[in-house]
């Protein structure tokens, strides 16, 4: 799990704890504070992904800037990436996930940090955008986001279906 700008593994700890309770081997990025792009980040993420790929392709979850790192990593190593889930990431036109990797962009119109339109990417056969209610800084603690992530991770590798909120949670998703 990759934190946003200025974030660390402590930032993503609650969401990783939740995923571990569901049986996933959720791990932090292990690179200290996310201070942007650089060779040390690229090399560190490549090393981290290689260490995780022993059990097969890994799903990458990136919050804000962490989502941009996830997309760049998936472009370099699509064979080692099972899926990408971005949370409030300013993807724009430059960071559209590679078509060979299933991708979900979670965004909020009330983000207040990242303009929500930058998180909306063209949808496709294995690419979707899911709108939630909430703030940018709250995305990692938002039950609607946790539900999307849990649902996406639970999908079989060979079958991709867009996210559909359970009836009891539909009010959490303005457009779905």
Give the location of each predicted region.
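Serine-dependent carboxylesterase/thioesterase catalytic core
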Residues: 1-10, 14, 18-106
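C-terminal catalytic-base region of ester-bond hydrolases, centering on the histidine
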Residues: 101-176
